[in-house]
Amino acid sequence: MIQHFRFGAPLPTDSVVQDIPVSAGPVPFLAAEKGGWGYRMAPDAIVYGLGEMPRGINKRGWHYVTNNTDESRHSEDKLSYYGAHNFLLIDGGAGRECFGVFIDFPGKVRYDIGYTEYDTLRFSTEEPDYELYIITGGDLNAISRQFRQLIGRSYIPPKWAFGLAQSRFGYKTAEDVREVARQYKENDLPLDMICMDIDYMQDYADFT
């Protein structure tokens, strides 16, 4: 079962493909806190999710920010990487229900997953306008399937995207890129794509 809650006046993100009616009831599992939500975790609870983030598959014991950050040093002390996947899959532990949480919000979301207090998960959005989905029913796999149905099928990249990519910082001209392609061909090396690094952007700013 998927329950949908709306707070404020959220921006449409087109992240959800199913039309889930907005619930007027209380949000299950979570307790409202100043600026966000909290969940009391059992000692054996496990928290999965957040997509491309540092540290292990169990996110418990650390804090995160979904912020689409071009972080050059991928170390375990970082809070953000490239991706922003605001989905948590929570195994409540022995005798407790599993459930999923999806925050549909286009800005920063902060998570404290047992970092400040090991038995407490907290998350908050930088603005009060967002959609919240709580997913229940069955095991973790069943909850994941419901989430996939909620957001629709993933984009399937073209075949060449699974090939060999050459990327570096510092190509100055188009001729530099063509020369790389020529060198690969002359040396009989496979090459499916050439990527330019962040220096092609205006003042290294995203999306320029």
Where on the chain are the PLM-derived regions?
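Catalytic and substrate-binding clefts that recognize carbohydrates or anionic sugar/phosphate headgroups
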Residues: 1-161, 168-170, 174, 181-186
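Active-site and adjacent substrate-binding regions of carbohydrate-active enzymes
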Residues: 87, 169, 179, 197-203, ...
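Generic preference for flexible, low-structure residues
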Residues: 115-119, 163, 180, 193, ...
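Core alpha/beta catalytic barrel or barrel-like domain that forms the active/cofactor pocket
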Residues: 157-168, 189-203
